[in-house]
């Protein structure tokens, strides 16, 4: 008989955000979007800033914003080790918009002291937060 669920743990340095049985996980890996379901091949990959859409064993969904991290898939267990993880409901749209504006302003600064890689990463995190907020407002 095929597996119907797999165990998922989502943890950050601050806390454990999710632990339980799931039907599926949609997440942004370093090479693009990933769909993880029971029976998925073992995998280890880095994660980009974005949304983790969790479909729990009972069919309900939970959305978590991830700033990046690592994903490990084993036969009966999936682990997300996030740099920073926040439940979508706890994201602050105004703060994300302000962070995006700051990053864009820093990107357009004409000084030689701009660390473009750091500014681009800051911009990617802010845009990813806004996408999660928009996706969850459509979901609700």
From Swiss-Prot:
Check the record and name the InterPro entries matching this protein: ATP_F1_dsu/esu_C_sf (IPR036794), ATP_synth_F1_dsu/esu (IPR001469), ATP_synth_F1_dsu/esu_N (IPR020546), ATP_synth_F1_esu_C (IPR020547), ATPsynth_dsu/esu_N (IPR036771)
- Residue ranges spanning the membrane: these are none
Keywords, in A-Z order: ATP synthesis, Cell inner membrane, Cell membrane, CF(1), Hydrogen ion transport, Ion transport, Membrane, Transport
Q: Does the keyword Thylakoid apply?
A: no
GO cellular component, alphabetical, reads:
plasma membrane; proton-transporting ATP synthase complex
Cellular localization per UniProt: Cell inner membrane
MF terms from GO for this chain are: ATP binding; proton-transporting ATP synthase activity, rotational mechanism
Does this entry carry the keyword Ion transport? yes
Membrane topology qualifier: Peripheral membrane protein
* Self-association and partners: F-type ATPases have 2 components, CF(1) - the catalytic core - and CF(0) - the membrane proton channel. CF(1) has five subunits: alpha(3), beta(3), gamma(1), delta(1), epsilon(1). CF(0) has three main subunits: a, b and c.
UniProt lists the family membership as follows: Belongs to the ATPase epsilon chain family.
The record's annotation in PANTHER family points to: ATP SYNTHASE DELTA/EPSILON CHAIN, ATP SYNTHASE EPSILON CHAIN, CHLOROPLASTIC
Q: What is this protein's function?
A: Produces ATP from ADP in the presence of a proton gradient across the membrane.
What name goes with this protein? ATP synthase epsilon chain
Q: Which organism is it from?
A: Colwellia psychrerythraea (strain 34H / ATCC BAA-681) (Vibrio psychroerythus)
């Amino acid at each position: 008989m095929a597996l119907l669920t797999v165990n998922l743990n989502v943890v950050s340095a601050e806390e454990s955000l999710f632990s339980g049985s799931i039907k599926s996980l949609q997440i942004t890996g370093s090479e693009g979007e990933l769909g993880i379901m029971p029976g998925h091949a073992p995998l280890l990959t880095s994660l980009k800033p974005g949304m983790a859409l969790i479909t729990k064993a009972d069919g309900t969904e939970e959305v978590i914003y991830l700033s990046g991290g690592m994903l490990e898939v084993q036969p009966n267990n999936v682990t997300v080790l996030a740099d920073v993880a926040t439940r979508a409901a706890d994201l602050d749209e105004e703060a994300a918009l302000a962070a995006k504006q700051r990053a864009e302003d820093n990107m357009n600064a004409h000084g030689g002291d701009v660390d473009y890689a750091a500014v681009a990463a800051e911009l990617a995190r802010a845009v990813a937060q806004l996408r999660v907020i928009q996706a969850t407002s459509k979901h609700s």
